A protein has these predicted regions:
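PRPP-dependent phosphoribosyltransferase catalytic core
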Residues: 4-6, 140-192
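Conserved G/P- and acidic residue-centered "switch" motifs that form tight phosphate/ATP-binding loops
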Residues: 128, 133
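Short Gly/Thr/Asp-enriched flexible loops that form oxyanion-binding sites at enzyme active sites
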Residues: 72-81
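Solvent-exposed alpha-helices and their adjacent loops that cap or buttress functional pockets
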Residues: 57, 114-118, 146, 167-169
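Short, glycine/charge-rich flexible loops or terminal/linker lids adjacent to PRPP-binding catalytic cores
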Residues: 80-123
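Conserved acidic residues
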Residues: 61, 121, 151
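Short glycine-rich phosphate-binding loop at a beta-alpha junction
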Residues: 60-67
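Active-site-facing substrate-recognition patch
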Residues: 1-59
Length: 192
Protein backbone atom coordinates (compact mmCIF):
# COMPACT_ATOMS: atom_id res chain seq x y z
CA UNK A 1 0.00 0.00 0.00
CA UNK A 2 1.16 3.52 -0.68
CA UNK A 3 1.46 6.21 1.97
CA UNK A 4 -1.70 8.33 2.09
CA UNK A 5 -4.10 9.68 4.70
CA UNK A 6 -5.15 7.13 7.34
CA UNK A 7 -8.88 7.11 6.53
CA UNK A 8 -8.17 6.43 2.85
CA UNK A 9 -5.85 3.57 3.84
CA UNK A 10 -8.56 1.99 6.00
CA UNK A 11 -11.31 2.49 3.43
CA UNK A 12 -9.17 1.19 0.56
CA UNK A 13 -8.44 -1.93 2.60
CA UNK A 14 -12.18 -2.54 2.99
CA UNK A 15 -12.92 -2.41 -0.72
CA UNK A 16 -12.92 -5.86 -2.22
CA UNK A 17 -13.15 -7.63 1.15
CA UNK A 18 -14.54 -11.15 0.65
CA UNK A 19 -18.15 -11.77 1.74
CA UNK A 20 -19.48 -15.01 3.20
CA UNK A 21 -22.98 -15.81 4.41
CA UNK A 22 -23.72 -17.13 7.89
CA UNK A 23 -27.35 -18.09 7.44
CA UNK A 24 -29.09 -14.86 6.44
CA UNK A 25 -26.22 -12.70 7.71
CA UNK A 26 -23.69 -11.28 5.20
CA UNK A 27 -20.27 -11.32 6.83
CA UNK A 28 -17.32 -9.41 5.38
CA UNK A 29 -13.83 -10.79 5.99
CA UNK A 30 -11.21 -8.16 6.78
CA UNK A 31 -7.96 -8.23 8.76
CA UNK A 32 -9.16 -5.65 11.33
CA UNK A 33 -12.29 -7.73 11.97
CA UNK A 34 -11.01 -11.27 11.42
CA UNK A 35 -7.22 -11.40 11.35
CA UNK A 36 -7.41 -12.67 7.76
CA UNK A 37 -6.52 -12.06 5.06
CA UNK A 38 -3.14 -10.86 6.30
CA UNK A 39 -3.03 -7.29 7.52
CA UNK A 40 -0.58 -4.88 6.01
CA UNK A 41 1.17 -2.88 8.74
CA UNK A 42 -0.04 0.32 7.11
CA UNK A 43 -3.69 -0.66 7.75
CA UNK A 44 -3.13 -1.24 11.47
CA UNK A 45 -1.01 1.92 11.72
CA UNK A 46 -3.68 3.99 9.91
CA UNK A 47 -6.47 2.63 12.12
CA UNK A 48 -4.41 3.27 15.25
CA UNK A 49 -3.56 6.81 14.12
CA UNK A 50 -7.21 7.63 13.43
CA UNK A 51 -8.21 6.48 16.92
CA UNK A 52 -5.30 8.26 18.63
CA UNK A 53 -6.13 11.54 16.85
CA UNK A 54 -9.81 11.46 17.93
CA UNK A 55 -9.34 11.17 21.70
CA UNK A 56 -8.67 13.72 24.44
CA UNK A 57 -6.08 11.60 26.23
CA UNK A 58 -6.10 13.78 29.35
CA UNK A 59 -9.60 12.38 29.97
CA UNK A 60 -8.67 8.67 29.66
CA UNK A 61 -7.40 6.43 32.46
CA UNK A 62 -7.70 3.03 30.78
CA UNK A 63 -8.22 1.53 27.32
CA UNK A 64 -10.52 -1.50 27.13
CA UNK A 65 -11.41 -3.91 24.34
CA UNK A 66 -13.02 -7.29 23.80
CA UNK A 67 -11.24 -10.52 22.93
CA UNK A 68 -10.33 -11.39 20.23
CA UNK A 69 -10.33 -8.98 17.31
CA UNK A 70 -10.26 -5.87 19.44
CA UNK A 71 -6.82 -6.93 20.68
CA UNK A 72 -4.67 -5.65 17.78
CA UNK A 73 -6.28 -2.22 18.10
CA UNK A 74 -6.03 -2.26 21.90
CA UNK A 75 -2.33 -3.12 21.80
CA UNK A 76 -1.51 -0.58 19.08
CA UNK A 77 -3.41 2.28 20.73
CA UNK A 78 -2.09 1.43 24.20
CA UNK A 79 1.50 1.34 22.97
CA UNK A 80 1.11 4.61 21.05
CA UNK A 81 -0.38 6.48 24.01
CA UNK A 82 1.30 4.84 26.98
CA UNK A 83 -2.11 4.22 28.56
CA UNK A 84 -2.79 0.93 30.38
CA UNK A 85 -5.06 -1.64 28.75
CA UNK A 86 -7.53 -4.32 29.87
CA UNK A 87 -8.99 -7.12 27.77
CA UNK A 88 -12.58 -8.25 28.28
CA UNK A 89 -12.10 -12.01 27.99
CA UNK A 90 -14.30 -14.82 26.71
CA UNK A 91 -13.46 -17.05 29.65
CA UNK A 92 -13.72 -16.66 33.38
CA UNK A 93 -10.71 -16.25 35.62
CA UNK A 94 -12.76 -16.21 38.81
CA UNK A 95 -11.05 -13.04 40.03
CA UNK A 96 -12.65 -10.99 42.77
CA UNK A 97 -15.07 -8.52 41.22
CA UNK A 98 -15.28 -10.34 37.88
CA UNK A 99 -18.47 -9.45 35.98
CA UNK A 100 -20.09 -11.92 33.56
CA UNK A 101 -21.81 -10.47 30.48
CA UNK A 102 -23.91 -12.33 27.89
CA UNK A 103 -23.37 -10.91 24.40
CA UNK A 104 -24.71 -11.68 20.93
CA UNK A 105 -23.69 -10.88 17.39
CA UNK A 106 -25.69 -11.10 14.19
CA UNK A 107 -24.80 -14.78 13.99
CA UNK A 108 -23.85 -16.12 17.47
CA UNK A 109 -24.07 -15.70 21.24
CA UNK A 110 -21.33 -15.93 23.87
CA UNK A 111 -20.26 -14.84 27.33
CA UNK A 112 -17.61 -12.27 28.23
CA UNK A 113 -15.91 -11.56 31.55
CA UNK A 114 -14.82 -8.13 32.76
CA UNK A 115 -11.98 -7.84 35.28
CA UNK A 116 -9.73 -5.12 36.76
CA UNK A 117 -11.90 -2.07 36.11
CA UNK A 118 -12.53 0.25 39.05
CA UNK A 119 -15.41 2.63 39.76
CA UNK A 120 -14.66 6.12 38.49
CA UNK A 121 -12.08 5.03 35.91
CA UNK A 122 -12.50 6.94 32.66
CA UNK A 123 -12.52 4.44 29.82
CA UNK A 124 -11.84 4.46 26.13
CA UNK A 125 -13.44 1.36 24.64
CA UNK A 126 -12.06 0.32 21.24
CA UNK A 127 -13.46 -2.43 19.05
CA UNK A 128 -13.18 -3.72 15.53
CA UNK A 129 -16.77 -3.79 14.22
CA UNK A 130 -20.26 -2.76 15.25
CA UNK A 131 -23.15 -4.31 13.32
CA UNK A 132 -26.19 -5.06 15.48
CA UNK A 133 -24.74 -3.63 18.69
CA UNK A 134 -25.39 -6.96 20.40
CA UNK A 135 -21.85 -7.17 21.77
CA UNK A 136 -21.25 -3.52 22.60
CA UNK A 137 -24.58 -2.77 24.29
CA UNK A 138 -24.40 -5.31 27.14
CA UNK A 139 -20.70 -4.56 27.66
CA UNK A 140 -21.29 -0.82 27.99
CA UNK A 141 -24.24 -1.44 30.32
CA UNK A 142 -22.05 -3.68 32.49
CA UNK A 143 -19.15 -1.22 32.55
CA UNK A 144 -21.53 1.56 33.61
CA UNK A 145 -23.00 -0.76 36.23
CA UNK A 146 -19.49 -1.28 37.61
CA UNK A 147 -19.20 2.49 38.08
CA UNK A 148 -16.77 3.11 35.22
CA UNK A 149 -17.07 6.28 33.14
CA UNK A 150 -17.65 5.65 29.42
CA UNK A 151 -15.51 8.56 28.29
CA UNK A 152 -15.20 7.48 24.65
CA UNK A 153 -16.12 4.51 22.47
CA UNK A 154 -14.45 4.14 19.08
CA UNK A 155 -15.17 1.29 16.69
CA UNK A 156 -13.10 0.89 13.53
CA UNK A 157 -15.82 -0.37 11.17
CA UNK A 158 -19.56 0.26 11.25
CA UNK A 159 -21.89 -2.06 9.35
CA UNK A 160 -25.64 -2.11 9.85
CA UNK A 161 -27.78 -0.05 12.17
CA UNK A 162 -26.35 -0.98 15.58
CA UNK A 163 -24.53 2.31 16.21
CA UNK A 164 -27.48 4.39 15.03
CA UNK A 165 -29.86 2.40 17.25
CA UNK A 166 -27.60 2.71 20.30
CA UNK A 167 -27.07 6.44 19.67
CA UNK A 168 -30.83 6.95 19.64
CA UNK A 169 -31.58 4.69 22.62
CA UNK A 170 -28.54 5.69 24.69
CA UNK A 171 -27.46 9.18 23.52
CA UNK A 172 -25.16 9.52 26.55
CA UNK A 173 -22.92 6.79 25.14
CA UNK A 174 -20.20 8.47 23.04
CA UNK A 175 -20.04 5.85 20.26
CA UNK A 176 -18.05 6.89 17.19
CA UNK A 177 -16.81 4.93 14.20
CA UNK A 178 -13.98 5.39 11.73
CA UNK A 179 -15.58 4.02 8.56
CA UNK A 180 -19.13 2.98 7.70
CA UNK A 181 -19.79 0.22 5.19
CA UNK A 182 -22.69 -1.67 3.71
CA UNK A 183 -22.84 -4.87 1.72
CA UNK A 184 -24.58 -4.32 -1.60
CA UNK A 185 -24.88 -7.04 -4.24
CA UNK A 186 -22.31 -9.15 -2.40
CA UNK A 187 -19.68 -6.40 -2.21
CA UNK A 188 -18.46 -3.95 0.44
CA UNK A 189 -19.49 -0.37 -0.26
CA UNK A 190 -17.99 2.54 1.67
CA UNK A 191 -20.74 4.79 3.04
CA UNK A 192 -18.39 7.17 4.87
Amino acid sequence: MSQTDPLTVLQDSLRGAPIIWKGEYPYFIHPIADGIPRMEAEVLRATRDLIVSMVDWSQIDLIVSVEAMGLPLLAAVGEATGKPTVVIRKRSYGMEGEVRVDVSTGYSSSTAYINDISPGERLLIVDDVISTGGTLEPLLESLEGMGAVLQDVIVAIEKGEGRVRLSEERPEWPIRTLSRIDIVDGKVEIIQ
